[in-house]
Amino acid sequence: MEYARKIGTKIKLYSELVMFSHTLFSLPFAIISMIWAAEGVPSWHVMLWGLIALVAARNGANAFNRVVDQSFDAMNPRTAHRHLPKRLLASKEVLWFVVVNYAIFIFAAGMLNTLCFILSPAAIFLISSYSYTKRFTYLSHLYLGFTIASAPIGAWFAVTGQFAFTPFILGTIVMLWIAGFDIIYGSQDIEFDRNHGLWSIPSIFGLKNGLRIAAVLHSIMVLLLIALIPIRQLGWIYVVGVIVSIVLLLTEHKIIKPSSRKVMKIASYNLNQVISMVILISAMCDYFLL
């Protein structure tokens, strides 16, 4: 009984470490990409190994990021409670977790098709290198978005084993969306970033300009969501989903308050998790019902 409790505690700690709930940012777009690529429901083989690959890749990347950033996390009052600064988990233990997840990712990619397997090392480099970008460029927000954009692109490859135009539009949408709300989230750390030599758009250009840039990125994201209507011949259900997403994005930018962690969590995470689900549900209903 005690052993089972320890295992449960460890699973909970690792789930918190990699922010498992944040899978909602990438998974919905990966599902859309799979459905469009398959022109329907993909095979169980593709769905199973595609999901395993996605979860393993993001678990490894998030855990690696926590190891790389732990010294900064320990100095930042906002992040000092995280697992590594508080020594709830050991660095070596987390690095083994990273290695295991990346190994699972490569194996899952190989189970999908040759293209996914060949690209898997490049994908690992991409998602791991993000952890260092904030040390030398304010474009780290876009790079983060770029890494998460690999989810819908990789999902398309998983189904077809071929390059195409549509997944790169989906990937660009994800990149701009993620970068925009990461800028909003980063506005909480302007002074900390400036004092410790970390680069971010808010710390370099200031709060107001940073939020303007985030708004521009989200505006372009919306235009690309609209562009998918004629490209994919989407119907009114998808259009309604886009309209709801626009309202949620406007709400997100309206309520921004860097001094309030609770409000910033809603603006940066909660509303965007709803947006991803709205787009997923509207795209799926549009495809299967119309």
Place the predicted regions along the sequence by residue.
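Extended hydrophobic alpha-helices typical of membrane-associated regions
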Residues: 9, 227-290
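Cytosolic, membrane-interface loops and tails of multi-pass inner-membrane proteins
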Residues: 1-12, 62-89, 183-208, 255-264
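Hydrophobic transmembrane alpha-helices of multi-pass small-molecule transporters
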Residues: 27, 106, 128-131, 152, ...
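Multi-pass membrane catalytic core of lipid/isoprenoid biosynthesis enzymes
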Residues: 48, 52, 70-120, 195-240, ...
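Membrane-embedded alpha-helical segments that form the functional core of polytopic membrane enzymes
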Residues: 29-32, 36-68, 78, 102-110, ...
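Intramembrane alpha-helical segments
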Residues: 7-16, 82-170, 250-257
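Residue-level signal for inorganic ion chemistry
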Residues: 18, 69, 90, 140, ...
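Small-residue-rich segments of transmembrane alpha-helices in multi-pass membrane proteins
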Residues: 27-33, 83, 144-159, 204, ...
